[in-house]
């Protein structure tokens, strides 16, 4: 595994993610510019819990993107959102397993058989996270897609199916965290993208709809929070990261008081 530190009570495919501060932060390395990718790896890797390599970087460079991130990261999150027939996804998981990543995403919509095949292929060496409802989908869009009951109902359903089929956790928007954590206690992991630090508005090109602050996501049950655009292209990444750390520490202090 790519982990530099671990939890003695955790499974082999788990990294230590508890506590306040930046251990629970996943930085999304979403770029196809190599200089930016390498710079982000070097800066964020030693400072946060996990680096995430997604489709943009992986399609551009393939496994070398993982190797670049691993040189700096405590843990690696490969975000490919695999979604195909069970045999094909199982083969892809076996290939990803050899890349020495800690987390790998699949789509919950692939169904129990696909998730179970992926879990068997993972063989405890990578934590499978089932993606539920993507954060750019708002309620009107879900209605147009003929998904009755809205995002919360579907996320809860898919999370239950994913856990029963062997997934280590799910990816969901911050808005579903509280209900999902009540229904699915730890060690089942909840990973929340759509994180916007306090004071960071939705800028031009921000296509995520179901969002929340980092502190709110942690307070309502997230184990990991995924942040990309508020951090990586920031004019002063160090200041942006310090502000995020302060937000999380203030929230943790308030929870203790």
Spans of model-derived segments:
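N-terminal amphipathic alpha-helix/helix-capping segment at the start of soluble metabolic enzymes
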Residues: 2-39, 178, 182-185, 204, ...
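Conserved anion-binding
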Residues: 21-22, 84-169, 173-178, 183-191, ...
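Conserved beta-strand positions in the central sheet of alpha/beta enzyme cores
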Residues: 26, 49-52, 77, 105, ...
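Conserved, mostly hydrophobic/aromatic
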Residues: 27, 51, 81, 104, ...
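Short, acidic/polar
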Residues: 32-43, 86-94, 151-160, 208-216
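Structural motif
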Residues: 46, 99, 165, 220-221
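Glycine-rich phosphate-binding active-site loops on the catalytic face of alpha/beta enzymes
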Residues: 101-112, 207-240
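C-terminal helical cap(s) of enzyme catalytic domains, especially alpha/beta-barrels
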Residues: 115-119, 231-256
